[in-house]
Amino acid sequence: MKFELDTTDGRARRGRLIFERGTVETPAFMPVGTYGTVKGMTPEEVRATGADILLGNTFHLWLRPGEEIMRKHGDLHDFMNWQRPILTDSGGFQVFSLGDIRKITEEGVHFRSPINGEKIFLDPEKSMQIQHALGSDVVMIFDECTPYPATEDEARKSMQMSLRWAKRSRDEFDRLENPNSLFGIIQGSVYEDLRDESLKGLVEIGFDGYAVGGLAVGEPKEDMHRILEHVCPQIPADKPRYLMGVGKPEDLVEGVRRGIDMFDCVMPTRNARNGHLFTSEGVIKIRNARHRDDTSPLDPKCDCYTCKNYSRAYLYHLDRCNEILGARLNTIHNLRYYQMLMEGLRGAIETGTLDAFVKDFYTSQGREVPELVD
């Protein structure tokens, strides 16, 4: 992987990630394909929304279908017929989400399979091996996602163990002679000094990119912004910056304003299946009866297949009838909305008009622009 940085506007960055399987324009949003599919979408449909790269879930793909079946197909690209770049998370967040059915030790994590209750062990080495089998273009280190809230002492212990796991991840990645890229993950909860210590340790180990983890886990939005404003300027400028698991459209805008290059989130797809549709004027809840006889498109500013061909009334009808097509059309729209937002942000950075773009984004939704800390 090669990262090129073209231009900046304030702290925002316009560039690209160059892989053998294709180029990813940044800032970029990655749709989430947890089980090797963006729910309800074919790879061609996902690509048509403007997506350059997908995220796959190491933990879930390890449990089902497993490494053996993946290797029989070649790798995840061949298994799901997506021949463009794929980033896989390490499984750390999913293990964190298991709650009481997992036990974290220095060696790794013991847990019971949420599928059949089988006892399973996952550690940094195994995570690297699974991601190698998946053929991930971007591999994430195995870390512990610090819960929120956490005391500073709890956050410190978690972060320091994640640093030790980062070194083990790096060593195993190198032992496997994996030709792809490995990203470190900055932890430290809402404590700036711990974030500093985490980043310093990761840079000493050396990675191809740096992710900000442990945010969007319940902390106030102000804390997320504060941590990003503190951490981003310290990340090596020649490396991509990835904000994990984020987020709402306004979170993408605010992340870009603070120097983030990459995002992922299930929100556009999950919300689509629940009838919450993102538009240039805010969220439309298509299940609301007001849309029953509305012949207008979801968003006249959107160029997606759904908006060009169907009315709000039709989408309301499909949802009321529990038709699969409704969830698919909603997903196409939400994914395209996210990609159009990223296209707009990239264009604004290129032309030095990011402030105007951000103001218009919030004004069109009747909201105030959040302030940046100098």
Swiss-Prot record:
One of its GO terms (biological process) is tRNA-guanine transglycosylation. Its cofactor is Zn(2+). The active site is at D89 (proton acceptor), D264 (nucleophile). One of its GO terms (cellular component) is cytosol. Disulfide bonds: none annotated. Homodimer. Within each dimer, one monomer is responsible for RNA recognition and catalysis, while the other monomer binds to the replacement base PreQ1. This is Queuine tRNA-ribosyltransferase.
